[in-house]
């Protein structure tokens, strides 16, 4: 058996990959082999090359197959391939990559409740870029984000064995993503048999953290600040403002119009339970609660945060930032 994990964005894929990489002995004891590319964390190289393959270019596909074909000849083993990049791959090309390999193939993929999925992906986009667009603009550019039925049907044309799981913690086995994933591979596995796990999380920004990053990106556009250590800066952002609730900006991006727009775009997600009953995505009333209240205190907090980031060497403040500049930017997102 080959388990092909399509790591849909914001569904704990990195945590799964680190666990698989760091527990080779455990996998070996259960006749499992985790296949990765040369970097050793996941199988990103395959989807990356497939992205540039024109139709069924056998030469390119064979070049990828050579990287793992000798490994999967072991008939008494099961194999795991994982990559976020499979989400954007052409299923037909992936089929040609694995066909006639001598193993049955089972697709594994996790799916999120639509509202949280849009929010989490928006936050990550703002965190990792210098973009300044509002949530409403992001929504309008992501029409396919929650078309779960199309995604599923495109893959089962070539891979009829498909396991879909609800990413919600209450739906996970023992409320544990790693255990939930491993139970798919090893149905008889008991929770206490699982090796100790490292906490690896691709954390999202808090709501004020998102607002701060939008303000920061505007300052970048105005050449008032510059980034000196991008990797460290982006990784540090989720750690900021964790001690503040900032209820004045709770879900500030989720206006009634935005909420209704996401709901209307996510019809397939809400009907996905017809295929997989456990994927019955329910909305919370709290999702509708949002605040867009500007306080002068936000400016002081932002200036303190900018100075702290400069002291750490992550950024440089190039020009004197006026309170009026910050106030104008804040109000752009809080109106």
Question: Would you name each region that the model predicts?
Answer:
Residues 1-335:
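Anion-recognition interface
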